Amino acid sequence: PDWDLFESGSLYRPMQGKIWRAVGFETQRGCPYTCTFCNSPSNNVEYKAETGGKFHRKKSIARMKKELDFLVKKYDPNLIYFVVDTFLAMSNREFDELKELYSDYKIPFWMNTRAETINEYRAAGLAEMNMLRMNIGIEHGNYDYRRNYLKRNVKNEVQIRAFQIAAEHD
C-alpha cells in the first residue's frame, strides 16, 4: 500500500514501551475458519456467491517480496504489522517459504493467530524471523461456551500449551 495520502505521523505506533515506525502488510486476505463472531465466514459466502471463488486468498511469495521491497524502500519501517486474521493459517511449506523470504528483512513484527496454529517448529521459526509480539485469539475461557456458541472447538489444553510454547521462544 501507498500511504502518501496520510500524514507521515500516522505511521508511528506505540508498542511495548517504544514508538515504532510501523507499516501494515498482508500475506493473505480472509480466513479459512468459521467462527460465529467474525465477519470472514459471511465474506466467504458473499464472495463465493458473487464470484464463484474463495474469499480466503494467499499472496504468492513473489508478490509478498515485491510489496515488502516497496514498503521497506519507501517507508523504512522498524516494525511490520502482519494484517492477517490468522497469520499462521498456512502449511509448513508455506511457512518455510515465508520464513526464507523474511530472512532478507528481519524487521521486528507482530501478528495475530489462533492457538491451534502454534507448535514448537513454528514458534522457533517466528523467533528466527524476529517476531516482537504475537496476539493469540482465545475469545473465551470456557471450552463449552467456545465450542457451542463461538464454533471454536479448541480444548483449553491446546490454548494453554500455545502460550507455553510462545513463552519458551520469547
List each language-model region with its residue ranges.
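Radical SAM [4Fe-4S] cluster-binding motif and immediate context
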Residues: 2-169
